[in-house]
Amino acid sequence: MKDLSNETIVHIKKDGVEYIQFKRLLEYPEIQHCYTLRNDNLDFKIDGDIQVLETSYEKICDALKIDKKKIVKPIQTHTDNVEVVTSASEQFKEVDGLITNKENITLSTSSADCTSLLLYDPIKKVIGSIHSGWKGTLQRIGQKAVKKMIDEFGCNPEDIICCICPHIRKCHFEVEDACFGSCFRLRTGHCRQVFKS
């Protein structure tokens, strides 16, 4: 894969794994983050082989020097549900966003075409990992995650850094007319700027 580094991201190839990191978040050594890239050495498909999935997590954990046992992986179902993580042993179902102020906990969300948001408040030391598919986006999961950071931890929205991970582009995203009509046309004029029929 070619080098994807640019003015906002760094493309890392290390120990047989590839991932990107946001330069803005790299300014804060107290946190770690990454967005893994699809390649022959990593496979994070939720419906794939469990052993391959576990091996992929081990590889990325080794590369980042994080404890695999401290990863919190929700069962995502394209909701607008955001939960606060207080322990790495917690399990979450029907949750697409996680936030925490606890140290040594890794938040993990999965996405293929969907958008992932990485949030960080360097003042309150709160992190967030949000899976924002089109359903969650229409339900404003990003906004709800920020609100939960405010309500639970007293974050100031002006302090929150939001990095938007790679995702499907408008030119490749097709939905059936019935879905477009019932979901997108009912929204504000903003949707007409972003989507076309």
What do the predicted segments below correspond to?
Residues 1-197:
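Active-site microenvironment for binding and transforming phosphate-containing groups
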